[in-house]
């Protein structure tokens, strides 16, 4: 099954996450199909906290991809803010 979930990057104590479309059997930070955005939980000032390529995200959702709980919440928050 294809899932849309967060993949961790960044350094120690400074997390940064990519929203990735991946096979659910792969590891968290392993091989992915496509990156569709990012989430920066420690963004300050003018830094961008969340970016989602909504066109690609909608494509994958139409193909049957399942979002993780956290990604679903981020998408909902992004839609409310826009």
From Swiss-Prot:
Q: What GO cellular component term, any one, is given?
A: cytoplasm
Name the Pfam families on file: Ribosomal_S16 (PF00886)
Gene Ontology molecular function: structural constituent of ribosome
What domain of life does the native source organism fall in?
Answer: Bacteria
Q: What S-S linkages are listed for this chain?
A: none
List the InterPro entries.
Ribosomal_bS16, Ribosomal_bS16_dom_sf
The record's section on Gene3D superfamilies has:
3.30.1320.10
One of its GO biological process terms is: translation
What residue stretch is flagged as signal peptide? Answer: none
In Swiss-Prot or TrEMBL terms, this protein is called: Small ribosomal subunit protein bS16
> What organism is the protein native to?
Saccharophagus degradans (strain 2-40 / ATCC 43961 / DSM 17024)
């Amino acid at each position: 099954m294809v899932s849309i979930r967060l993949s961790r990057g960044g350094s120690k104590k400074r997390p940064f996450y990519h929203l990735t479309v991946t096979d659910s059997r792969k590891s968290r930070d392993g091989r992915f199909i496509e990156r569709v955005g990012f989430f920066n939980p420690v963004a300050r000032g003018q830094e961008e906290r969340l970016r989602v390529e909504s066109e690609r995200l909608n494509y994958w959702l139409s193909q049957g991809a399942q979002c993780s709980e956290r990604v679903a919440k981020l998408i909902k928050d992004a839609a409310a803010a826009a």
